Amino acid sequence: IFTYDDKHSVEDGVPFFEENAPNFFGSNYSIVKGFTDMLMKQTKTLNLRIRMPITDEIHPRNFITKITNYEKICSIKNSMSVLDDLLPISIDMMKENMEGTYNFTNPGAISHNEILEMYRDIVDPTFKWKNFTEEEQNEILLGQRSNNTLSVNKLNSVVDVPHIKKSVF
């Protein structure tokens, strides 16, 4: 629902907060997700914003599995969710009847290349990949991709979550 803009860039490190209005409508999915996110704020629900989910399983929905199978990678730093860290927290939050929107990612941001370098170093020393620019990516995809860093200050006020780079390694 967010993408880097004039106020939030990869370089400046200014994240998006739970209160920020969606600014990314580059695909039908993101349009629906953005409007749903705004509607969720009007109800007494727990809304956990997961991004680029990572697990320790080889699974088609696992972000690492996905990018190791892509022909080319557009490497931009993003917030990501390591599910082994976060799913137990979500259960505790539900048991406590917590409400509201939470950016449900590990603190920090990590690039696709950083993850693939770790994959190569730890899993497959022969692994290779090619990069392309965001513009080149947009030319071949039906919809654009959002890239962003989310603040986890609200989540960290409830529980400590490990930094993304520590957790992925």
PLM feature segments, named:
Residues N78-S81, I110, L150:
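Residue-level signal for the nucleotide or nucleotide-sugar donor/cofactor binding architecture
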Residues P125-F127, L141-F169:
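C-terminal amphipathic/interface module of NAD(P)-dependent oxidoreductases
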Residues I89, M93-N147:
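Mid/C-terminal beta-alpha module of Rossmann-like enzyme folds, strongest
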Residues G26, M38-D85:
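NAD(P)-dependent short-chain dehydrogenase/reductase
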Residues D5-S9, I58-N62, I115-E117, L141-Q144:
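Short aromatic-enriched loop/helix-cap "lid" or pocket-rim segments at secondary-structure transitions
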Residues F2-L48, T55:
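Catalytic helix-loop patch of NAD(P)-dependent Rossmann-fold dehydrogenases
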Residues K7, N28, G34, I54-T65, ...:
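Glycine/proline-rich active-site loop of Rossmann-fold NAD(P)-dependent oxidoreductases
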Residues L83-M94, I164-F169:
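Short, amphipathic alpha-helical "lid/cap" segments that border enzyme active or binding sites
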